[in-house]
Amino acid sequence: MPCRKESFLLLEQSVTVGSGEVDTLVARIGEALQLNAQRTPTSCSMAYGALKPVSRAGPSCSCVRGRSTPYPVCTPRGAARHAQHHHHHSPRQQGTGGNKRLCGRGWGRCNCRKHAGTEEEDDPHELLQELLLSGNLIKEAVRRLHMAGESPDPPGSRRVSECTETTVQ
């Protein structure tokens, strides 16, 4: 546990970085987003099983919002909560306001591009741009790093412990 405490102290310190270091960080995050996109299901509708894809004009959104994230996420962890939510209520009916769900701050219009009903995963660069514009890039990177720590490592990758820092070469 002391390692975790040190990492929080490190985050509280003010750090001055150059543009080159920021570019390197953005490149690393972009690579992590691409790698994670390759491991995730091809669409959110497939992760939810029998649920039909939601169109943009639909009255509800298939977004799942956890307590730790202020924006919608589509993960197997979130899918379990989503599926559990639907088991306790009546079947979905198009055009009714009864199945309205919050999509998180800033997503009030439920304009989630990744839930547009397409069968292909969004372009990782488009997702990176969305995260940059919404200000959630760091939160998404931390969430994905935590998820990567919970899942088994793919062959050929190296695991980073919580106590050490690594540098990009």
Swiss-Prot record:
The keyword Transcription regulation does not apply. GO terms for biological process: dorsal/ventral axis specification. Pfam families: GSK-3_bind (PF05350). Residues 79-91 have a biased composition (Basic residues). InterPro entries: GSK3-bd. GO terms for cellular component: cytoplasm. Residues 122-145 are annotated as: Involved in GSK-3 binding. Keywords: Developmental protein. It comes from the Eukaryota. Residues 75-100, 147-169 are annotated as: Disordered. Disulfide bonds: none annotated. The keyword Cell division does not apply. Belongs to the GSK-3-binding protein family. Binds GSK-3 and prevents GSK-3-dependent phosphorylation. Regulates the stability of beta-catenin in embryos. Maternal GBP is required for dorsal-ventral axis formation. This is GSK-3-binding protein. It comes from Xenopus laevis (African clawed frog). The gene is gbp.
